[in-house]
């Protein structure tokens, strides 16, 4: 499977523990393409349809013509076997906003 950074896939995030986002849902790939080529895992941020405009850990987007949020506070590594079909891709502008948000939250 050829997975690219900023592609959006459906992924099966079950089983989950506690407050982890679960179910089959869209996820955005945030790991570097070189990692995606050679590893059997990818780093993702799950998407949710529950919109929290005041949460600084979330980025609002449109995905498959629906409002969604990228849950940067729920970054995790998953097996590529959890990925289903590719459904969308972040725009360059949203990818830049996502990189900035990740840096602001976890950087330096």
Where are the model-predicted features located?
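Conserved functional hotspots at enzyme active or ligand-binding sites that engage polyanionic ligands
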Residues: 1-108
